[in-house]
Regions:
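Short acidic, S/G/P-rich loop/turn micro-motifs used as interaction or catalytic elements
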Residues: 19, 23, 45-50, 74-78, ...
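Glycine/threonine-rich flexible loop motifs
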Residues: 48-55, 79-85
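Structural motif
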Residues: 38-43, 67-71, 115-116
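Short, conserved loop/helix-junction motifs that constitute active-site signature segments
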Residues: 57-64, 110
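Short, glycine/acidic-rich beta->alpha junctions
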Residues: 22-25, 49, 95-100
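A domain-level signal for caspase-like cysteine endopeptidase catalytic cores
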Residues: 1-47
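Alpha-helical scaffolding within the catalytic cores
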Residues: 26, 51-59, 101-104
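Active-site-proximal C-terminal subdomain of hydrolase catalytic domains
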Residues: 67, 75-154
């Protein structure tokens, strides 16, 4: 929340979404947020795609979304238990589509212009640092997404 508030005025007055522990978004809320955004930020636990209904996601059209930042792949005891319970009901192929590369490809096919995503599991603190670096470089200094990611890699 601190990072969003810090860069709120520099980017847009129309930030929309769910922050903190407000509630768990419904599938309809996810779809509404995704289809009406020009940029999308996910900062959360486990795999981003595990929070969505895959069959509905593959049918979506998201051409307005120019940039999607997925700071996911964070694991806690509770999130691991939730994901394990959820994965029991899924096929191997369904779980495979939720991996980072496959998620980026799927989002690209739905119309998302650029995807910045983690490739490996990480911590909330490391994702907070990534978000700070990306926000500073994209919103304050106006760097391109490619340059901001390159700075992030260093």
């Amino acid at each position: 929340k601190e990072i969003l508030e810090k860069y709120h005025d520099l980017f847009t007055l129309q930030w929309q979404g769910v922050a903190g522990n407000e509630h768990v978004p419904s599938q309809a809320e996810w779809e509404q947020l995704l289809t009406n955004c020009s940029g999308f930020l996910f900062y959360g636990m486990e795999r981003f795609m595990s929070h969505l209904v895959l069959n509905r996601m593959v049918a979506m059209n998201i051409p307005k979304c120019h940039l999607m930042i997925l700071l996911d792949l964070v694991r806690s005891k509770e999130s691991y238990q939730r994901i394990m319970n959820s994965d029991i009901q899924k096929s191997y192929l369904h779980i495979a589509i939720e991996r980072p590369t496959e998620t980026a490809m799927l989002l690209s096919l739905t119309g998302v212009g650029s995807v910045i995503a983690n490739q490996w599991y990480t911590t909330l603190q490391e994702n907070a640092e990534r978000l700070e670096i990306l926000s500073k470089n994209l919103m304050t200094t106006g760097r391109t997404t490619g340059r901001a990611v390159r700075i992030l890699q260093k």
